Structures are given as structure tokens and as C-alpha cells.
A protein has these predicted regions:
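Low-complexity, Lys/Gly-biased intrinsically disordered segments
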Residues: 1-29, 45-47, 123
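A short beta-sheet element
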Residues: 23-24, 40-105, 123-124
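Hydrophobic pocket-lining residues within nucleotide cofactor-binding pockets
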Residues: 27, 39, 127, 180
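Cytochrome P450 core scaffold surrounding the K-helix E-X-X-R motif
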Residues: 31-36
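Short, solvent-exposed loop/turn positions at domain surfaces
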Residues: 45-46, 116, 162
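A short glycine-rich beta-alpha junction/loop motif
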Residues: 77-85, 115-141
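Amphipathic alpha-helical coiled-coil/heptad-repeat segments
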Residues: 129-198
Length: 198
């Protein structure tokens, strides 16, 4: 990837009618279908940027320890900046399988990046040389389907837990409001100290 000169905004950067340009901050370890920054055709001609196809697996190579190793799966044609490594799966690899497999490496890449220098990073070579186990395509698809189902299940449980937390907060707030406004008499609920005989 590459970064068009930001001093030439009009020549290289545009609105949503341009070419999506992926930066490390766009990577959320999920399918990427939208970005915040778009570049022009002129940017493609004048820089190392090139448009990558949907199904490209992307990995953040630098940007600090919270960013190194973050990844995404392109769901749209897009260009990437120089801090992102794009991996184009071959015909023997299902893109989503490779995407999920690459996620496994993030903790290892982060450890290596932290020991590399003051500003943590990993090299494109290190990403490209990551050993990827390739089961038959049928098994790759089965693994991806299993992960999708488990992810959907996890998302549903997470949403249910969030609703429960919100309901408990509402009830707590209502209870406090009722106690403060006198709608609930709490005088008999707290034991009173015995009067000391004089």
C-alpha cells in the first residue's frame, strides 16, 4: 500500500465517490465494507497504492501495540496504506478461512512487535511467512460456518446480557427515585439503634 501526499488534498483525496482507502484505524477484526477516507484515480497513478479485490485479508503492521496485528477482510474493492499488509488468498484458500486463521497470530505478532523497537511494528515479510495450515476446501468451509454460528450465538448472548444490564439500571434508578421522593417508606427497613437509657 501507499499514502498519497496529504499536502495535495485536492489531487489525491475525495469524497465517497472516490476509491476507498483502508488505514489501520479502519481494521476492526471483521468484514470491512466501508471506510472514512477516499482517494482519487490520480493518487493511484502517482503512488504505490493499488486497488485490491474483495476477499483480501488485511493486517495492520504498525501503529502501536493496540493496532499491530489488527485485521480485516475486504468486502469491497479498496486501496490500502503502507501500514497495512494485504494478503490475496489463492484458489485453494477460502478468504474467510484465511482471515479467521490469521486472527490467531495477533498475540504472537504483538509480542514480537513490542520487542522490535520503540514504536512496535511487524514486517510484511513476517506476515507473509506466517504458516497457514490448509485443510481441504470442504473442511475450510465447515470451519468458517462453525465460527459464524458460534459468533452469532455469542453476539445474541452479548445482546441479551446488555439488555439485562440496561433493565437493571432502569430498575435501580426507579428504586432510588421512589425512595428519595417518599413513594417508598424506608424507615422501617433499616434497624434503628436502641435508645440508650439515661
Amino acid at each position: 500500500g501507499g499514502t498519497p501526499n496529504t499536502a495535495q488534498q485536492e489531487a489525491y483525496y475525495t469524497d465517497e465517490t472516490g476509491i476507498p482507502w483502508v488505514r489501520t484505524m479502519d481494521l476492526t477484526n471483521e468484514l470491512l465494507t466501508s471506510v472514512e477516507v477516499y482517494i482519487t484515480e490520480q493518487a493511484l497513478q502517482d503512488t504505490a497504492c493499488k486497488v485490491l479485490p474483495p476477499g483480501t485479508v488485511m493486517v495492520a503492521m504498525y501503529g502501536g501495540d493496540g493496532t499491530v496485528g489488527k485485521n480485516g477482510l475486504l468486502g469491497i474493492p479498496a486501496a490500502i496504506n503502507q501500514a497495512v499488509c494485504g494478503l490475496l488468498p489463492s484458489d485453494s484458500v477460502f478468504p474467510e478461512f484465511m482471515f479467521r486463521f490469521i486472527q490467531f497470530f495477533r498475540p504472537f505478532w504483538m509480542v514480537g512487535a513490542e520487542s522490535s523497537r520503540k514504536d512496535p511494528n511487524i514486517s510484511q515479510e513476517r506476515v507473509r511467512n506466517a504458516p497457514v495450515l490448509l485443510p481441504p476446501m470442504e473442511e475450510q468451509l465447515a470451519i468458517v460456518e462453525f465460527l459464524r454460528l458460534q459468533s452469532d450465538r455469542f453476539d445474541a448472548l452479548s445482546a441479551e446480557a446488555q439488555r439485562a444490564v440496561e433493565l437493571l439500571r432502569e430498575r435501580r434508578s426507579a428504586l432510588i427515585s421512589a425512595a428519595v421522593t417518599g413513594k417508598i417508606d424506608v424507615r422501617g427497613l433499616v434497624p434503628q439503634p436502641e435508645a440508650v437509657a439515661a
